[in-house]
């Protein structure tokens, strides 16, 4: 049989189904759970069960029935807050207590800071020229030092209004800008 081993912050028995709340990363976990014959859940008690509600778990249909993914704004929600599996698929729940291990980025240097300033200045100029609305547009950010420099420069630029963003990983710089009110909403695959 095929097995899926996944991490969760909460596992709830709800009749014939098990509700699994992932931790900081979802990615392909719903697909692994759907395709596996048996699922082993690592219940990580270092991750708060209050993470339930952060996730928007959605799997598109297989072709040829696949349709567009109906996300039209950054804050749209189209899925569920947990992964559900039939109760008979759950093989085991193994408890652990391990915080996320996140590698640190090197500090920003003159080059990365200048890149950030240039991007922010370019976007500001595009707004002033009318090619970007005065309310700004959602951005898509990568991960790492250059992304942090760009986000920092956008956040520091008073002529750029609070904005929304898509990203693969909602990293510390994004959370900081959310706390400051500079990012209104962020959508990502991992925290």
Where are these regions (language model features)?
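Conserved phosphate- and dinucleotide-binding cores of soluble alpha/beta proteins
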Residues: 1-138, 145-191
């Amino acid at each position: 049989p095929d097995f899926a081993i996944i991490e969760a912050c909460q596992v709830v028995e709800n009749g014939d189904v098990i509700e699994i709340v992932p931790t900081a990363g979802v990615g392909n976990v719903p697909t692994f759970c759907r395709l596996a014959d048996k699922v082993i859940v690592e219940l990580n008690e270092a991750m708060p069960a209050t993470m339930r509600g952060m996730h928007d778990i959605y799997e598109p249909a297989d072709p040829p029935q696949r349709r567009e993914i109906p996300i039209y704004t950054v804050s749209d929600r189209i899925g569920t807050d947990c992964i559900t599996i039939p109760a008979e698929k759950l093989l085991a729940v193994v408890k652990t207590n391990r915080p996320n291990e996140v590698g640190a980025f090197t500090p920003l240097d003159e080059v990365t800071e200048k890149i950030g300033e240039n991007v922010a200045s370019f976007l500001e100029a595009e707004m002033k020229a009318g090619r970007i609305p005065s309310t700004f547009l959602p951005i898509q950010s990568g991960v790492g030092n250059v992304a942090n420099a760009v986000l920092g420069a956008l956040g520091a630029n008073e002529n750029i209004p609070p904005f929304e963003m898509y990203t693969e990983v909602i990293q510390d710089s994004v959370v900081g800008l959310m706390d400051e009110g500079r990012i209104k909403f962020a959508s990502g695959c991992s925290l």
